[in-house]
Amino acid sequence: MTDLLTAAVLGLVEGLTEFLPVSSTGHLIITGYLLEYTGPKAESFQVAIQLGAILAVVFLYKERFAALFRFGTGHGRFSGLRGWYLLALTSAPASVLGLLTHSFIKEHLFGPVTVAWALAAGALYILAVEHKGEGTRYETLDDVSPALALGIGMFQCLALWPGFSRSAATIMGALLLGSRRRLAAEYSFVAAVPIMFAATGYDMYKSYSLFSPADIPFWAVGLLVSFASAWAAVKGFIHLVGRVTFRPFAWYRLALAPVVLLFWS
């Protein structure tokens, strides 16, 4: 497979899975092994192409992000300094824990076998939360409280285990804490932006020496495909989120996990 086609495939996998509760990192690791694109450079590329998916969310929720820069009244409660405060509360736990465990995660958890166990663990987590059902206390982004934002941030720490899924951790955590399904999904998407920007920037800073100007076309293809596929995935997911449960994602994960274990054990 040519280098640019490899970049396109990885960008497609990243975009389609980043905001679904199936783990984009897990799928990228598995896909990378299938394409024989592995190692430190591949791992950093898999993190870097998250930027395309991040920008897709910023584009889709541009009004919400614009409200964060409006500091007067009349823009809703999820705006201005209060909006930034809520996002900071959600981002802080995983940011701090991620900085402390970055080297350990890259060295010990970026592999198909550990991803398979994370896929299974995340599936059981989804099924357990679905058994409880959605809450009714929080319905829109303007209803998000500091306690809810921090609680979701604590659940987000589960996603530091590659394969668990940041979306699964935050969406199901929000449901446990009393959110409606649509709010859980939308806040998960919006709150992903600062933490993913931070994680991508930090990883690129740590790994910049691995790349050269010759890699720019490879990166560009991955980022563009990631952006387009994430845009489509988020649009479709939001359309369905109020109509279906998250159980199908759990069954998919439970089906995929043993296949990965059998293939790589």
Curated annotation (Swiss-Prot):
Coiled coil: none annotated. One of its GO terms (molecular function) is undecaprenyl-diphosphatase activity. GO terms for biological process: cell wall organization; peptidoglycan biosynthetic process; regulation of cell shape; response to antibiotic. NCBIfam families: PRK00281.1-2, PRK00281.1-4, undec_PP_bacA. It catalyses: di-trans,octa-cis-undecaprenyl diphosphate + H2O = di-trans,octa-cis-undecaprenyl phosphate + phosphate + H(+). It comes from Oleidesulfovibrio alaskensis (strain ATCC BAA-1058 / DSM 17464 / G20). This is Undecaprenyl-diphosphatase. It is found in: Cell inner membrane. It holds the Pfam family BacA. Belongs to the UppP family. InterPro entries: UppP. Catalyzes the dephosphorylation of undecaprenyl diphosphate (UPP). Confers resistance to bacitracin. It is an enzyme of class 3 (hydrolase). Bacitracin is thought to be involved in the inhibition of peptidoglycan synthesis by sequestering undecaprenyl diphosphate, thereby reducing the pool of lipid carrier available. Its EC number is 3.6.1.27.
